[in-house]
Amino acid sequence: LKLDFVPFWVSFHLGLWVTTLLLVICFPLAWVFSQAKGRWVPWVESTASLPLVLSPTVLGFYLLLLLSPRGRIGQFFLSVFHVRLAFSFPGIVIAGCIASLPFMLTALRTGILALPPHLLEASYTLGKGKVETIFRIVIPNMKSGIIAGIVNTFAHTLGEFGVVLMVGGSIPGVTKVVSIAVYEKVESLDFGGAHLYAAILVVVSYLGVLLLNRLQRQERRR
C-alpha cells in the first residue's frame, strides 16, 4: 500500500498552529472567566462552548459564509492583508481555532480554579501585581491544566473533519488533512488505504492521551 505522508504533515502543521494560537488566546479568557462574577459570564461561556454541541457541518457552513470573500471576516482579510481565507490553510487554521476553542478554554479555566485561593491572596498581600502573580504563581502551579489543554486541543484538531472539509475543501498539500484522506479512501472503496491512515491516526491519538495521563500523574505527585 502506498502511503502519502502529506496529509499527515498538513494535519500536524494545522494542529501546531491551532494549539499555539489557542493557548495564547484562551489563557487571558480563562483568567477573566475564573475571576469574573457578572451576569454576562454564563452567556459568554455558553457561546464559547457552542462548538461542542453544534454539528461540525453546521459550524463549518457558517464559518465558510464568514470566511468567504463576500463574508465580513473574509472580505476584511482579503482587502487588508490580501489573504484569501476560504479554501486556504489560514482559513482552516481560523476554523480549527473556533472548533477546538472549548477544549483549551475549559482545561485552562479548570486549572486556574483548582489553584488554592491562599496562593493568590499571599501574592497580592506581598504587593505583587496581577501580571507578576500570573507568571510567577498561576502558570507554574497549573501545569497540569496547560498540558491537558495542549494535548486535548492538538488531538481534537488532528481528528477534525467536518469543519475543515467545509471551510478548506480537499486541496492536496494545502487543506487535505488525514481525516479527509480517510474519507476519500473509503469513498473510492480503498478500504486498505483507509485502514492504514485511520490506524496511524488512532495510534497517534492514543499516544497523546497516554502522554497526558502520565504527565498529569507526575504533576500530582509533586
Predicted segments, located by residue:
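Interhelical loop and adjacent transmembrane-helix boundary motif
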Residues: 1-6, 167-210
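Transmembrane alpha-helix signature in integral membrane proteins
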Residues: 4-33, 52
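Alpha-helical transmembrane segments of multi-pass membrane proteins
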Residues: 9-17, 51, 131, 135-144, ...
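Cytoplasmic-entry segments and transmembrane alpha-helices of multi-pass inner-membrane transporters
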Residues: 32-65, 120, 134
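C-terminal transmembrane helix and the adjacent membrane-cytosol boundary/short C-terminal tail
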Residues: 40, 109-120, 124-125, 137, ...
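Membrane-interfacial helix termini and adjacent extracytoplasmic/periplasmic loops
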Residues: 60-97, 167-171
